[in-house]
Structures are given as C-alpha cells and as structure tokens.
C-alpha cells in the first residue's frame, strides 16, 4: 500500500503587474576569478531563477498544440522566457490570457446538447485551471488563466442572441465558483473598456448595452490600413484561422442553409463572407486584449505555428491534430474505447446507443448505453440499477455513485473490470465497506487478472485482498493506492505512470484520488497508459509506505 502525502501551498493574492521592460538577451554574465560572497549568492540566485523559468515554460508548453510547422522552440519560447523572467524577478503570478468560450453552436440537432455549458466546458475549465495549479507547485505565486469571453464579437453573425451569450457566460462562472477553480479568472469587453465597476449584472442590462459597446470596440480598435487579402496571402496563421472558421461555419449554420435550401456555391460564399467578418472583428478584439493586459502569456484556441501566441489544447488527453476541438462546438460523451471524455459532433448516428446523463453540478453529457456501463444489472433490483450515476473525472478516470450502503456483491465484477480497462481509476461512492470480503476480492482477481486492483476504505483502515493496516492520522486527508499482485521489481514500474500523474496535478489529488471516506473504493488497471501529457522533469512524486 502506498501513501501520497501532499503539501498544498496557499495561493498568493494577485497584485498589479508593471509594464514589461525591454530585455537585452545578448548580455552574458562574466565573473572575476574571486567573487565576494554577496556576488556569489546573487549569481546562484540568478541561476536558480533561470532554472525555475525554464521549468515554468516547460509546464506551459506541455499544453500546446504542435502542428507540422510548429515554431515554438525557435520563435515563441525566447519571448515566453523573457516574460516569465519578469514575473519571477518580481515574484508575481504568471498571467496567461485566452480569448475563448463565446457561446454554444447554434446547431443543436447535430453538434451540441443545448445552449448551456455542459461537462465539456467543465473539463476544459479544469484543464486551464491545472496550468496555474502546476505552476504553483514549483513557484508559490502560482499562475492564472484569464478567460476573455469573445461571444459578443460574433454572435450576430451566427444568429445567436445577446441574451444567450450572457447566459452561457454566467454558466461558466457558476462552474468555476462551485468547483473552486482558483487559477481561473474571467473578463469581457465591458470590463476591459469601461472597468469592472460598470459590467452589466443582469441579462436585460447586458442586452440593452452590448450593441453600443460593440460599435465602439470595432470602430476604435480595428487596425488602421488592415487588408484581409494581403494578410491571408502572407500570414500562414491567418490562413489557418480562416480555414478553421469556414470548417466550423459549414456545420454551425447547417440548419440555416437547409431551411433556405441554399446551393453549395451559395453556402461556400456565405461561409467565406462570415469568416472574413469574424477575422476582422477578432483583430479588433485582440488589440483590445493586448492594450488592456500588456504583460501576459497569450494563449489561443486557434491553430497556429506558435509564433505570436501559443495554441493550446482544451482537453488533456489529446492534441487533436492541427485544429483544437472546443466544447462549445461539440458534445461530451463516454464511449467504449477512449480512456477519457471525448468531444465530437453528437455521436448519435452510429450503431452504439447513448443516453443523456449529468454530473453532480447538473451538467450534461452522453454515455454509451452498452453492457460495460451496466455494472449493476439484477432482475430483482431494477430500481437500484437505475440509480447508478457515472461522472467523468478530470483529467482521467470515472466516478460511479450508487445509493449509500449498496453491497459490493451487487456489482457485475466482470463488467467493472471491463470498464476499468477503458477508464482507470474508477472511484466508487456509496458502497457498504463491510461487504468487502476476501471472497469478493478473489472473485475480482479471477475475472480481472493480476494487473488490476480493487481497494476499499473502512473508517481509518484500508482493506485489500489480504491486508488491513491502520492509517496514521486522518484517513480523510490520506491518499493511497493498492499495489498490484506483482512483487519485487515488477510491482513498482506498473504503478509509476499512475503515481507520477497523480502527484503532478493539484486537481488530480482532489478529484481523482479524492478524499477517501468509508464506502469509497478504487479500481485501477495498471496497464492503462494514462492520458496526461506531462514531461518527466515536471513531475514531483511524493510517496511513502502506509
């Protein structure tokens, strides 16, 4: 049995950041043969800060999307390092900014579940939050991602009302507040132009004022002499964005085109016109963001070669090729093959049936309605099977909630094992811990094999197949994991991917390993390659014997 002991560093209050000074990157340190003690200490501090800056940059870069023409190492990284040097020298939080989260696609039939944020938005917000959390593990001031909602720039072009844009943003705020995502901040054009004191607080006020603000934004911040066709021919990033917009518009406006029985040529022309308008408006919006926040790490959810800004993935387990997949254009679902939540157009046209589910926040997602998800299926207790709830966890894994006191013997253990091969770890809530017996453990090992483990927690006692050891201190504050049946040199390597990933993310400690309580159990398949894109040098694995 292993214990993962974590020390949480308190967050530091954000202060006003001064403008970024010009750095002379050509300078080199030169030292006399004999250094005074204070000079030597200063040199050591500078070297330590430089190493810290490199580690922070490595964390941020691990979220990027790397296309075939990626120029991060050559072009963007030197600028990123200069910005991070300033933050570290001032002991300021790392400020990252991303314009994103406009509104849900208007194509509710084929692309999204509805107009409100769902589990896709939740997972992506937790993903952005993990950037700041990981930075804080090595740099106490931490970091935060400021999301600047850009919905007002484009909603009228896609037939989405101002009221719907406001409600979508409010839903995002509720997710962040309820999950306590302390490394996420929000901003919008009202905040950036008129100040936080003048931001609309009601849907009616927002709808009555947004038109005038948009006119001012596009009039005042549109670049002088901007020529779209010239930029498209010279800037590969503009061409990528343009193609990406057309790609989304073809599906976002599919119902609009169908109702008007538009020809293919008319559809292409309409999408091109709208995409041009979106890019022109986006230029003005980017200029506003740059002016309002002159010192920041600029993130982007659009494809690019990573020269002027850093293109990032919105989910942890896939880079999604060149084009990021966004939750506001897609449906979140659990299937039979992916190791984590997937995002795509509604998966309702294939052979696999899906059912609508919701997490503990009431956010929706789809779940494959297949035997492996029917972990309780007893003819004499049909109501019990209906009460089983599945909830995807960030960045991987699954929580299964059952009515409190449910005997573990009611589970179809072969289906639990099959599910664990896709979603690992699985955390069960609500089980009766006294029902976990050696016979059940033997049954699970028989159907699952030696590479899987099932652990359950009694009050202060972790029970496995053959051992029961008292946990020192508070059981609720302990993090631990069952070691597989292998011993010696074969045991530890099987667990290293899980332990490394679990120790690396603040969110994992709270939401995947969870605060275990009586009645919670964990099933893990140690063969699963966990979907966390962490480089080895960024991992901090803390463990000890229980």
Curated annotation (Swiss-Prot):
Keywords carried by this UniProt record: Oxidoreductase
Keyword match Oxidoreductase: yes
Main enzyme class: oxidoreductase
Molecular function per GO: oxidoreductase activity
Pfam families from the UniProt entry: DIT1_PvcA (PF05141)
Stretch forming the signal peptide: none
Membrane-crossing segments per the record: none
E.C. designation(s): 1.-.-.-
Intrachain S-S bonds: none
Function recorded in the entry: Isocyanide synthase involved in the biosynthesis of isocyanides (or isonitriles), a class of microbial secondary metabolites. The presence of an isonitrile moiety within a compound imparts unique biological (cytotoxic, antibacterial, and antiprotozoal) and chemical (transition metal coordination) properties and enables synthetic and biochemical applications.
Family: Belongs to the isocyanide synthase family.
PANTHER family with a match to the protein in the record: SPORE WALL MATURATION PROTEIN DIT1
Protein name per UniProt: Isocyanide synthase B
Organism (species): Aspergillus fumigatus (strain ATCC MYA-4609 / CBS 101355 / FGSC A1100 / Af293)
Gene that encodes it: icsB
């Amino acid at each position: 049995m292993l214990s993962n002991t974590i020390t949480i560093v308190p967050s530091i209050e954000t202060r006003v950041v001064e403008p970024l000074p010009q750095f002379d990157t050509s300078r080199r340190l030169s030292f006399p043969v004999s250094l005074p003690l204070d000079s030597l200490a200063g040199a050591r501090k500078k070297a330590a800060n430089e190493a810290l800056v490199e580690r922070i940059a490595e964390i941020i870069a691990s979220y990027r999307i790397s296309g075939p023409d990626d120029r991060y190492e050559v072009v963007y990284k030197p600028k990123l390092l200069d910005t991070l040097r300033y933050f570290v020298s001032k002991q300021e939080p790392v400020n990252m900014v991303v314009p994103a989260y406009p509104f849900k696609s208007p194509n509710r039939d084929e692309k999204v579940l509805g107009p409100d944020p769902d589990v896709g938005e939740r997972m992506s917000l937790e993903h952005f939050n993990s950037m700041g959390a990981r930075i804080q593990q090595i740099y106490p001031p931490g970091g935060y991602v400021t999301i600047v909602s850009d919905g007002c720039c484009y909603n009228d072009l896609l037939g989405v009302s101002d009221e719907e844009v406001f409600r979508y943003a409010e839903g995002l705020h509720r997710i962040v507040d309820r999950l306590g995502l302390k490394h996420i901040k929000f901003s919008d054009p009202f905040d950036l132009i008129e100040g936080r004191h003048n931001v609309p607080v009601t849907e009616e006020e927002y709808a009555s004022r947004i038109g005038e603000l948009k006119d001012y934004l596009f009039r005042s911040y549109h670049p002088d002499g901007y020529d779209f066709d010239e930029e498209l021919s010279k800037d590969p990033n503009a061409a990528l964005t343009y193609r990406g917009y057309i790609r989304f518009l073809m599906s976002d406006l599919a119902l609009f085109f169908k109702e008007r029985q538009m020809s293919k040529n008319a559809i292409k022309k309409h999408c091109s016109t709208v995409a041009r308008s979106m890019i022109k408006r986006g230029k003005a919006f980017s200029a506003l963001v740059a002016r309002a926040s002159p010192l920041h790490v600029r993130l982007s959810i659009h494809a690019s070669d990573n020269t002027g800004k850093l293109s990032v993935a919105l989910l942890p387990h896939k880079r999604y090729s060149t084009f990021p997949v966004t939750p506001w254009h897609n449906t979140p679902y659990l299937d039979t093959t992916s190791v984590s939540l997937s995002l795509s157009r509604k998966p309702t046209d294939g052979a696999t049936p899906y059912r609508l589910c919701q997490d503990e926040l009431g956010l929706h997602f789809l779940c494959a309605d297949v035997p492996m998800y029917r972990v309780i299926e007893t003819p004499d207790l049909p109501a019990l099977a209906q009460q089983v709830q599945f909830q995807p966890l960030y960045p991987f894994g699954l929580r299964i909630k059952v009515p409190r006191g449910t005997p573990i013997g009611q589970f179809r253990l072969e289906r639990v094992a099959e599910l664990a091969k896709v979603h690992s770890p699985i955390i069960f809530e609500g089980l009766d811990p006294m029902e976990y017996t050696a016979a059940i453990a033997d049954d699970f090992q028989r159907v699952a094999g030696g590479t899987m483990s099932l652990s359950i927690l009694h009050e202060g006692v972790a029970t496995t197949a053959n051992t029961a050891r008292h946990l020192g201190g508070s059981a609720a504050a302990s993090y631990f994991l069952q070691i597989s049946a292998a011993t010696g040199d074969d045991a530890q390597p099987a667990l290293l991917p899980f332990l490394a990933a679990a120790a690396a993310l603040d969110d994992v400690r709270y939401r995947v390993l969870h605060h275990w309580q009586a009645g919670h159990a964990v099933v893990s398949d140690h063969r699963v390659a966990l979907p966390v894109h962490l480089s080895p040098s960024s991992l901090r694995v803390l463990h000890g014997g229980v």
